[in-house]
Amino acid sequence: MSIWMEGFKAVRTLNAAGFEAYIVGGAVRDYLLGKDVDDVDIATQASPHQVADIFTKGVHINQEHKTVLIPGEKGPIEITTYKGETLAEDLQKRDFTINALAMTETREVIDPYGGRQDLQKRLLRSYDAQKRLSEDPLRMLRAARFISSLGFEADRQLVKETTVQKAALQRCARERVVVELEKLLKGMETEAAFAFLQETGAIHSLPGIQITDSQLAELMRLPKQQWDSGDRAWLEFAICTGGPSSMAALPLPKKRKQLVAAGLKAFEYRQTQQRWSDWQLYISGLAIAMQIEEIRAGRQLPSIQKEELAEQWSALPIKAKSDLAITGRDLLHAKAAPGPWMKEALQAAEKAVVTKKCPNEKAAILAFLTMREDGK
């Protein structure tokens, strides 16, 4: 059963228990746009404890936000008590009219604030933008995200209020900023999104991010491509903004920062070299090398076909250090005292094998290292 159908099942269950309940927000928006629905939110007049009494298995209550998560086959479904006394009051408080939509169990759309018309116009609008943005300043960045992901245009009142209130973005938690910025970067219309942030001045109010005008110009030239990978999105960002230092203050996972740093190093290598050397391909890895060629192609730079890279990778004598025919134990047999020299020797052996200066055979490698030591 799809999460969309599971949502309707939950709505029917709440209705049968005597409570108003509706699928709301992005799920309804995406349904009307003909997009796949990936997650479902439900608004109800029932309190969290009443919801938990109805859905007894595996529920998780967030009392602060009056939300209950119930398990589903395709992921959890979020059920939230009305913000206000009625559905209309709840929808009024939502960020944009295109998200202020609800659907009954019979698929009747409830649209008190013109969200369907705005969907048709491809317009991003807030009901009382001044209030909506002051309630949650992150909505200014969310506006840019929807411009990128949906290809919509912000209405002039939203632009005006973002310009007025942009300084409030500094109060937003950086974790929330990262989520929205990543979704923006993954969208097709990044140029329009960054143009909105530039016009309003909001780009210079994002906490943890310092972007120069020239870097912003680079971001606005990102290719019109949709990326599923967060690693790819942040690598594109790093290339445009001068490297990992531009992301140092952002709470990204350590592994992601490491992958971005490795990707940036590989990109800079290809900026100065027409081909991948065997050694650079080895230390970068095939996945990163292929990603760099995709990035170059997207920027209309000369690029190497994936098949050619895969063939070069396949011809490498080893694909990882663990493939090396010797270990530190083999080195100790040749030289009794352990020490830093072992790491250096293994690295030299690894490079010699990859670059085909030495076959990947124990005796040959030990002989190579002996000659190297004698030549020092």
Swiss-Prot record:
Does Nucleotidyltransferase appear among the keywords?
yes
Molecular function GO labels: CC tRNA cytidylyltransferase activity; metal ion binding; nucleotide binding; tRNA binding
Q: Which residues bind Mg(2+)?
A: 39, 41
Sorted UniProt keywords? Magnesium, Metal-binding, Nucleotide-binding, Nucleotidyltransferase, RNA-binding, Transferase, tRNA processing, tRNA-binding
Q: Tell me a GO biological process for this protein.
A: tRNA processing
Per the UniProt record, which EC number(s) apply here? 2.7.7.-
Q: SUPFAM superfamilies annotated for this entry? A: Nucleotidyltransferase, Poly A polymerase C-terminal region-like
Question: Which catalytic reaction applies to this protein?
Answer: a tRNA precursor + 2 CTP = a tRNA with a 3' CC end + 2 diphosphate
Kindly list the positions annotated as binding CTP: 26-29, 94-95, 99, 136-145, 176
| Required cofactor(s) | Mg(2+)
Give the protein's function.
tRNA nucleotidyltransferase involved in the synthesis of the tRNA CCA terminus. Adds the two cytidine residues to tRNA.
Describe the family membership recorded for this protein in Swiss-Prot or TrEMBL. Answer: Belongs to the tRNA nucleotidyltransferase/poly(A) polymerase family.
Record-given protein name: CC-adding tRNA nucleotidyltransferase
Q: What is the species of this protein?
A: Shouchella clausii (strain KSM-K16) (Alkalihalobacillus clausii)
Q: What is the lineage of its organism?
A: Bacteria, Bacillati, Bacillota, Bacilli, Bacillales
